[in-house]
Regions:
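Active-site neighborhood of divalent metal-dependent phosphoester bond hydrolases
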Residues: 40, 47-100
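N-terminal active-site segment of His-dependent metallophosphoesterases
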Residues: 1-50, 56-60
Length: 100
């Protein structure tokens, strides 16, 4: 059984597209995205939409990483301090992209 595992796309859509191209050429039996698909980069929403399509169409499996947990937390909890507010600038942007 061939298993492809990738992680740390960090919301860079061209990187995810390149990964998909390589994986598709390899023809694995199973594909696992091992976290950190979103956050930090410019296109969390685009990466999530593309991966979700692969999940639905091809059965790719997601595993949440710390960035997914952090983005989800931003959707439900206000920053605890001014320092956390500054840290969350990009994460809040990622939340806005994926919440739509």
């Amino acid at each position: 059984m061939k298993v492809a595992v990738f992680s740390d796309v960090q919301a860079v859509l061209p990187a995810l597209e390149a990964v998909i191209e390589h994986i598709e050429a390899w023809h694995p039996d199973m594909v696992v995205m091992a976290g950190d698909l979103v956050n930090r980069g410019p296109d969390s929403g685009g990466c999530l939409a593309l991966f979700d399509g692969m999940r639905r169409e091809r059965g790719w499996l997601p595993v949440y990483g710390n960035h997914e947990v952090w983005v989800l937390r931003c959707g439900v909890q206000a920053p605890a301090s001014e320092g956390e507010r500054e840290m969350r600038r990009f994460t809040d942007l990622a939340w806005q992209q994926v919440a739509d």
